Amino acid sequence: MFLELSFLTYSPLRHWKVGKGHKLAVLGLGGLGHMAVKFGVSFGAEVTVLSTSPEKEADAKKLGAHKFIVTKDEEHLKSVTGYFDFILDTVSAPHDLNLYLSLLGVNGVHICVGAPPTPYQTHAFSLIGGRKSLAGSLIGGLPETQEMLDYCAEHHIVSDIEMIDIKNVHEAYDRMMKGDVRYRFVIDMASL
């Protein structure tokens, strides 16, 4: 679980050389998003969490995010139009990419690592107006995985999980469907 969570966010941030002087928005603060915040902060980027859930602000700040924006608050969202260099999109629910593309500055990159069940609908002018890019990331290899593990060990970066007994798997599923998990459930193999 740690490898999946970490690699899906580490690899694109490294590929696009996100770091000091960059403004990174992490869209969604769940299993992938919380690792994206940790990596973004450790790479030296200014990290903002974009979330539909205002109750996640305290978690975002605890993880090191510099800013937090509730995406349902149109005025707050407008205040960051054209602001970000990168958006790392970890959301697996359907959402409007055009809205988030407007938050990118010139040459900004929106990187999708979440996988919604329906296709994205994107207007051409959401991209061409500012020479913006829409990208995805799900690749890497053993050398990069080892690099990530070494980096995490050196910087004390770990995934936040809740360990559960196998007998509680149905309760964990119900909680997951309600969005009540910080940030992944892991089954204690000793409980099998």
What kind of feature is each model-predicted range?
Residues 104-106:
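Helix-to-beta-strand junctions that scaffold the AdoMet/dcAdoMet cofactor pocket
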Residues 20-29, 41-99:
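Adenosine-nucleotide cofactor-binding segment
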Residues 52, 142-192:
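C-terminal hydrophobic helical "lid"/dimerization subdomain
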Residues 1-15, 27-35:
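A glycine-rich, Thr/Ser-enriched phosphate-binding loop motif common to dinucleotide/cofactor-binding enzymes
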Residues 23, 108-109, 133:
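Short glycine-centered segments of the SAM/dcSAM-binding site in methyltransferase folds
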Residues 13, 37, 57, 97-100, ...:
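Generic hydrophobic/aromatic pocket-lining and core-packing "Φ" positions
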